Amino acid sequence: MKKKEMFLDYKSLVKSSLIAVVKHALNKTSEYGISDGHHFYITFDTTYSKNEMPQYLKKDYPKTMMIVIENEFWNLKVDQEFFSVDLKFKGKIDHLKIYFSSVKTFVDPSLSFTLNLDIEDKVIYKKSDAKTKILKKKQIENKSNIIFLKPKSS
C-alpha cells in the first residue's frame, strides 16, 4: 500500500454508497416509470468535462444546474458511470448525459428525502493523537480486543 493511499477511505466509501442509492432510484424509474408522487431534483456540476449537454444550457448554468425528473422526461438510461435523459427546455427536447461523480444533490421531495453527495475533501472522523495513544495503551494492557482462534485438532 502506498504511503498516501488510505486503508479505509471513508469519503470514497460514503460517496459510492450514496451514488448507489441514486442509481437504484433512477434504475427503478427507468424500468417502471415514476409514480406515487415521486419526483427527483438532481443538482450537478456543469463544469464536469465528461457531462454532455447543449451549449446554451452550459452558458445559462455555468457552475451547477438542477434538473427535475417528474412528468416530462424521456429515454432515461442508467449506466455504471452516468445516466442520460431527454428533458424539455424552452419548449425543446434536449439530451443530457450526466456522470454520477458530478452529482451534488439528489432530492425526492415527495418523501422529504435528500442526499448530499458533495462530500468535502476532509477527513470525516478523526481522533486526536493523544486520545489514540491512550486508547492503544489501554488495549495493549487489557488485551480484551484480541481474539485467539485455535486450529481444530485432528
Where are these regions (language model features)?
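Short hydrophobic short-linear motifs embedded
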Residues: 6, 123-153
